[in-house]
Amino acid sequence: MSADVRDILDMERANTPEVTRDSFLATKKRNFERTKTASRRPEGMHREVFALLYTDKKDAPPLLPTDTALGIGAGYKETKARLGMKKVRKWEWAPFSNPARNDSAVFHHWKRVTDNSTDYPFAKFNKQLEVPSYTMTEYNAHLRNNINNWSKVQTDHLFDLARRFDLRFIVMADRWNRQQHGTKTVEELKERYYEVVALLAKAKNQTSEKKVFVYDVEHERRRKEQLEKLFKRTTQQVEEENMLINEMKKIEARKKERERKTQDLQKLISQADQQNEHASNTPSTRKYEKKLHKKKVHQQPRPSRVDSVVNAIEIGSSGIKFADLRGSGVSLRSQRMKLPANIGQRKVKALEQAIQEFKVDPAPPPTEDICTSFNELRSDMVLLCELRTALSTCVYEMESLKHQYEAACPGKTLNIPPSLVPIKTEALDNSTN
């Protein structure tokens, strides 16, 4: 069709293959290329893992590990046993002896004819400990006098067992001849053995070459007694011990909590001291100091951190720093009474309890004077709660010291001055809780 159109328009024909009978009848087979199916990455599989499983040819991963060193499809390097390729090696039934045995026993095993080694291959594992020996002269000079009255026959039997069983004292105690030498425990065998070793090393001047082991028999006996008592505990004793451990953990937790509260109080007092120093240079402070000086001319109070905190409260220092919204554009006056976000939940709860205790309106009308006074009041309430917590901590410490003193000194009672004991202890405890 396209050729006819080109003839009508006098256009050149395209180079098309000549139509023949064979091509028209399609007698020759056409070469159809197989469409390649692209393998898709399964869902949930990482791209790196998929790239390791599939090669560039997009072949599926093998079901079994193969070694293609001999070519594709060769499988493993040695897929079949190559029998008859080498000459058969000869074996013989040969005798051998174990050098670890002293009875000259002869055994047999199979070995190669070409193997000319005569040593037993497992003889290298025959490691023996060096047990010292002594002569009659050395025994009479150094080993005869001992606390537990060991005889030479008993000592010889002990060292014979030590050589036979390589210082396995449990086995040595089991093999001890009780009929001839009496009953000996494992601790007694160890004590006598290490005593003899130390005396021989001292007599032969070998203490500098190798450190001598010192065996504490009393410590070993106490250790075994404690282990035996621990093993024989009843179920009630185990439960009681677990209960005591849990109580000890609770006491430690309460102690850490008190220490943390003490540190917070110290920080609060230091902040009050700094604010007191900063506020001491203001005109209002100077007037206040002049009034105090006129009223208390003859009184000279002792300076302390508590006084500095009280003075800071009277001057106007606050435990809560409220946001200053004067230069931040248009805002509601009630936003000035909003608590800052950096206050912890514990202080917020303590402040709410104090407001309920003193029956203060939690949301007063936000006038200018009420906002300032309400913020100062809440700041003083927070400081009051901190001081109450510190006071209860001090009371608890005094009571614990009193009990410790009475326990250490029976029959004596520690009298605490009434000035140090708060009057309303229950109210303090309720406020801190």
Swiss-Prot record:
Pfam family, one: SANT_DAMP1_like
Basic and acidic residues composition bias: residue spans: 252-264
Function of the protein: Involved in transcription repression and activation. Required for larvae and pupal development, and for normal innate immune responses. Involved in modulating the activation of the immune deficiency pathway (Imd), acting either downstream of, or at the level of, the NF-kappa-B factor Rel. Possibly functions with akirin to regulate Rel, and its interaction with the Brahma complex protein Bap55 suggests that it may regulate the IMD pathway at the level of chromatin remodeling.
Gene: DMAP1
Region: Required for nuclear localization, residue numbers: 1-204
Oligomer status and interactors: Interacts with Rel. Interacts with akirin and Bap55.
Keywords: Activator, Chromatin regulator, Coiled coil, Cytoplasm, Immunity, Nucleus, Repressor, Transcription, Transcription regulation
Biased composition (Basic residues): 288-299
GO cellular component: cytoplasm; NuA4 histone acetyltransferase complex; nucleus; Swr1 complex
Subcellular location: Nucleus; Cytoplasm
Gene3D superfamilies listed in its UniProt record: Homeodomain-like
Domain Myb-like: 148-197
Keyword Transcription regulation annotated: yes
UniProt cross-references to InterPro entries, sorted A to Z: DAMP1_SANT-like, DMAP1, Swc4/Dmap1
Primary site of residence: nucleus
Disruption outcome: RNAi-mediated knockdown is larval or pupal lethal. RNAi-mediated knockdown in adults results in reduced expression of the antimicrobial peptide genes DptA and Dro in response to septic injury with Gram-negative bacteria E.coli. Adults infected with the Gram-positive bacteria M.luteus display increased expression of the antimicrobial peptide gene Drs.
Native organism: Drosophila melanogaster
Regions of compositional bias (Polar residues) in chain numbering: 268-285
Gene Ontology MF term list: transcription corepressor activity
Annotated spans, Disordered: 252-305
Protein name: DNA methyltransferase 1-associated protein 1
Gene Ontology BP term (one): DNA repair-dependent chromatin remodeling
Coiled-coil stretches noted in the UniProt entry, renumbered to this chain: 186-281
